[in-house]
């Protein structure tokens, strides 16, 4: 799952992801080729295909999917399970902190981690847009995030 606060940022990210999938399908001699007969839209790609079993049309295949979500409201990052949830352009997302906290439920089932949350992108904004990323960065353990300290951090 790839999320961004606005559709422009999400679409630019998804264009790159879809380009990478096309490359894998076209240039890896079939090694990474996955059919996308059932879902192949600008916001969702699912590796599945239709087959007939006893005359019934059924979906089959890997069933893995990549979905893009405009998460301008934290409630849009709910109700699913995911192995990876990416918060693109996290430094430009005024609802990042609440979305990140709610996103934890997508990768955790009964206290067992089944996936990870990733936040990345711009840190160049200021004010409310940057507050969530700043909070997570300076107190990573509270949000189950691996801390990153560079040589310029005093503590």
Predicted feature residues:
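Short, conserved "post-DEAD/DEAH" coupling segment immediately C-terminal to helicase motif II
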Residues: 95-115, 120
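Residues immediately C-terminal
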Residues: 73, 92-93
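A generic structural motif
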Residues: 28-48, 113-121, 144-154
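Walker B catalytic acidic pair
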Residues: 86-92
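Conserved P-loop NTPase catalytic core
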Residues: 55-56, 63-67, 81-85, 98, ...
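SF2 helicase motor core recognition
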Residues: 74-81
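Conserved nucleotide-state-sensing and coupling region of NTP-binding domains
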Residues: 2-72
